[in-house]
Amino acid sequence: KVIVRGFVLMALGWVCNGLLKLEFAELRFWSVLARIGMAWMAGALIYMHVRHWKHIAAVILVLLVGYSLASSLLVAPDMPEADALTRAGNIACYIDRTLFGVHCYRPDYDPEGLLSTVPAIGTALLGMLAGRWIKWEHKGLTGTRKALGMCCAGVILGLVGYLWSFWTPINKALWSSSFVCVVACYSLLMLALFYYVIDVRRWRSWDFFFVVIGMNSIAIYMLPRFISFGF
């Protein structure tokens, strides 16, 4: 089921990219939904086979450190004089334009490409650990403490991301490891807030709108690709 769901998300991404037009010559291979599908699928398979949270954290660390080293030290063979953190010289961009060519978002790179999916798997695993933390039942571990725990983890990841940015900048297009940490910081802080307000304090009179969006996020994302709303 994990693999099927992952490839379904990739297929939906191809639909958003114009698959139904049957113009395959320059159809973009990667997409936001393909990135989500690949990262979630790989993350879920890792999560299913690596059960202890410390081991999962170690996997995340290896993914982020490995990608950070590769993206900052390895220079594209076709542009040896370029900086490793530019589109021309970055190894992730080189792999995308070499393997996918005109099927990339732009001629020289794709922001949701192959190698940059590696740190995105780390993003997916961090989300899975957050879900495990919320579901964890332990004596004395109240909802309030869970929210505080997520806040603390978020602050720590934010500091790590900031310090990491001195080595590799916070860059969404490259999905840099520092970007992963900073985004995880914001996400955990927001999750802690909504978890505390909705699940702990039970203030739910206002949340229907957000529940609808959250339960139909993929459909909402795809809708503007088929219907023009005039803005």
PLM feature segments, named:
Residues 1-231:
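Alpha-helical transmembrane segments and their immediate juxtamembrane cytosolic regions
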